[in-house]
């Protein structure tokens, strides 16, 4: 069976105990009301009344603000002291509870900067519940003075940025940044550097390819020119050899002609 203590999130800072009593009127006897800045706790005598209040009043308007109503975390044994002005840390849940119920991780992540070192993840989660349902919270890990908060919906994340950015927690004004935007900016810068390096390598490869092509073309042209010039001396050699081969024949013919002439002269005498 659920507990008797109910958490109120997104509570208007101007809300008073009378407003809270009027809001929960008709849901059973209230044992205690503990209001903080932006959130609060209501304790019923009967846990069934607390169940009904969570089921029917979650998302309703209280002092012109839609509040979130959910069961509060179990308090430690040492924090049972009652009273309307109880210590602000009495509503913390013990660390063992975190192990038993693992948090739900979502993509609706919010980065909290300039976080005081005195603020724990429990304090941060309770503070951020003013904006919506918080599924996960962590502080000072891995970076000091920085926290991470994840919401159940993107609308709660935007609501937190609009309402809680610049607010003070333990004397420090926090700065809220959407986690996806930070990741996108880093990925864009990395992609730009990668694209520039890739374009440089591509231009270099293109230059080397064009240079190799020009060199291969020049080599092919020189080879073609040398090939076209080489037959010329062969023709000249053929011409020279033919002229040389014809010269003995002409000598023989001249000799035969001279012999025939000499014979004709002798026969005439």
Curated annotation (Swiss-Prot):
Molecular function GO labels: protein kinase B binding; RNA binding; RS domain binding
Keyword Glycoprotein belongs to the record: no
Induction: By insulin and hepatectomy.
Keywords for the protein's UniProt record, in alphabetical order: Acetylation, mRNA processing, mRNA splicing, Nucleus, Phosphoprotein, Repeat, RNA-binding, Transcription, Transcription regulation
Keyword Transmembrane helix carried by entry: no
Phosphoserine, modified sites: 86, 224, 226, 230, 247, 250
Assembly description: Found in a pre-mRNA splicing complex with SRSF4/SFRS4, SRSF5/SFRS5, SNRNP70, SNRPA1, SRRM1 and SRRM2. Interacts (via RS domain) with PHF5A (via N-terminus).
Protein name stated in the entry: Serine/arginine-rich splicing factor 5
Species of the source: Rattus norvegicus
